[in-house]
Amino acid sequence: MTNFQDKPNIRIMFDSLAPTYDKINKILSLGLHLTWNHSFVSLLGRSDHLLDLCAGTGHVALSYIQKYPQASATLVDFSTKMLENVQECHPLAPFSYVISDVTSMPLPNDTFHLASMAYGLRNLSSPLEALKEVHRVLKPKGRLGILELTRPATYNPVHLLHKLYLNLVVPSVGRFYSGNSYAYSYLKESIRNLPCDTSLERVFHKSGLHIIRKRKLLFGTATIWILEK
């Protein structure tokens, strides 16, 4: 797992990306991240309240309340600017906000039935510590859904194309639209350094969360896991 010891610098990076984050993600994913988000929300299932971790600009939480209009959400992110972006763009959304690292959340034990984490796992300095913290705040039989960008298997015909896309297209597009080539080189490296499924799933198990469902998207370029406490 990519281990970035200097959290303040990573936080500053995400703060700087907030104004252009959604636009660039749409371009880089060719709009597929919206489809993936909808698939993710469908697999999460219904709950009155969603704990959205590494919430960013709130796309998963917004998709969730569109599907389940009676629901509300708590958005957790360590980037103040990302959460401010959600508040400014969606002031009437039924959201509460917590500025916090996922590894140490100011939330009580055994509180939430359902949590989500989209595109955040690879950014965690200590995935096991973060997942143990999620385990702490989930109620018994509570669920965590994870959606993450992953690498196709080396035997997959898409593997080489995906590698070229990460190495050439992602940093160039990120630099053009945000002026921050480092941030999108970081994105490339974070995907490349994400452990294989077996290693990740061992971490899930150690945290006390158990896989009840798994789905590969677009030849393995993204993966959804549904975990249960």
UniProtKB/Swiss-Prot annotation:
GO biological process, one term: menaquinone biosynthetic process
Keyword S-adenosyl-L-methionine included in the entry's annotation: yes
Keyword match S-adenosyl-L-methionine: yes
UniProt superkingdom: Bacteria
Residue sites binding S-adenosyl-L-methionine per the record: T57, D77, D101, V102
InterPro entries, A to Z: SAM-dependent_MTases_sf, UbiE/COQ5_MeTrFase, UbiE/COQ5_MeTrFase_CS
Alphabetically ordered keywords of this record: Menaquinone biosynthesis, Methyltransferase, S-adenosyl-L-methionine, Transferase
GO molecular function: demethylmenaquinone methyltransferase activity
Reactions accelerated catalytically: a 2-demethylmenaquinol + S-adenosyl-L-methionine = a menaquinol + S-adenosyl-L-homocysteine + H(+)
Pathway per the UniProt entry: Quinol/quinone metabolism; menaquinone biosynthesis; menaquinol from 1,4-dihydroxy-2-naphthoate: step 2/2
SUPFAM superfamilies from the UniProt entry: S-adenosyl-L-methionine-dependent methyltransferases (SSF53335)
E.C. number: 2.1.1.163
Record's function text: Methyltransferase required for the conversion of demethylmenaquinol (DMKH2) to menaquinol (MKH2).
UniProt family annotation: Belongs to the class I-like SAM-binding methyltransferase superfamily. MenG/UbiE family.
Name of this chain's protein: Demethylmenaquinone methyltransferase
